[in-house]
Design a protein with these regions (language model features):
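Metal-dependent nuclease catalytic cores that hydrolyze phosphodiester bonds in DNA/RNA
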Residues: 1-95
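Mg2+/Mn2+-dependent nuclease catalytic core
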Residues: 82-175
Length: 175
């Protein structure tokens, strides 16, 4: 099972309540828009990390603006170990694809890019922390290289970006 499928299942009840509240058509529209925006910003960030000079070529202005807001955070990344790496944990029987394993402010971290239409608080990011904990654990399991930290870099529409930092051990237990 993928980490994404597992976490989706855990949050299914909340998503169902939200869909009932806003209606199926509106929920589908919002979901498509969020997914598309997230993919565009994620792709730019990946190209930027890989030092591809044309990382903004042909990209819509809203995605460029959101990406540019997170550049100061991305520039704190160094010593990249893995970009878009497929990972599997024999222990947890889970698989997934990490955005990035690299040093953030000098600490080897599982780094994930997120986008949001509005500012999120720490309490609304638990699934992100569990996802990051899985990536850190699976990377260590596969390579023998310890990854203790989780970093979530979140571009927020028309707002300053958010940075969440957690430790793997705190979020591995729920998995």
């Amino acid at each position: 099972i993928s980490i994404t499928a597992l976490l989706s299942e855990l949050s299914r009840e909340g998503i169902s309540r939200w869909r009932a509240k806003v209606g199926a058509e509106e929920a589908n529209r919002i979901s498509r828009q969020a997914s598309s925006r997230g993919t565009r910003v994620h792709n730019i960030a990946e190209s930027y990390i890989k030092n591809q000079e044309d990382h903004l070529e042909g990209v819509l202005p809203d995605a460029v603006e959101m990406f540019q807001s997170i550049i100061p955070l991305i520039d704190r990344i160094d010593n990249v170990h893995c970009v878009e790496g497929a990972l599997y944990s024999d222990e947890l029987k889970l698989a997934g694809r990490t955005d990035l394993i690299a040093e953030f402010d000098g600490a080897l971290s599982a780094i994930d890019y997120k986008t949001s239409k509005r500012i999120k608080i720490w309490d609304h990011c638990h699934s992100y922390f569990m996802q990051g904990a899985f990536y850190a654990h699976a990377y260590e399991e596969r390579t023998g290289i310890p990854v203790k930290d989780i970093v979530i870099i979140m571009a927020v529409e028309n707002e300053e970006p958010l940075l969440f930092r957690e430790t793997k051990d705190r979020w591995l237990e729920p998995l």
